[in-house]
Amino acid sequence: MENEVVFFCRKCNHHLFAKNPMINTLKVISEMDCPNCGEEGYHNWILSHIGDSEKEKENYNWK
C-alpha cells in the first residue's frame, strides 16, 4: 500500500498505518487503545509520517 498515514504509540512505539484516512477514521484512531501494549487511546497516538507498510514492514517488530 502506498501513501499511508503512520502513527506511533507514545508508550511502546507500535506503528499504525492508515490508508487514506478521513476525519472519522482519525477520530477512531485517536480514541483507540494500542493493540500492542494496551495503552489507553486518548492522546496516545502521534502522527509520524506518510509511509508504505509493505516497504517498511522489515523495519518494525510487528506483534
UniProtKB/Swiss-Prot annotation:
This is SPbeta prophage-derived uncharacterized protein YotC. It comes from Bacillus subtilis (strain 168).
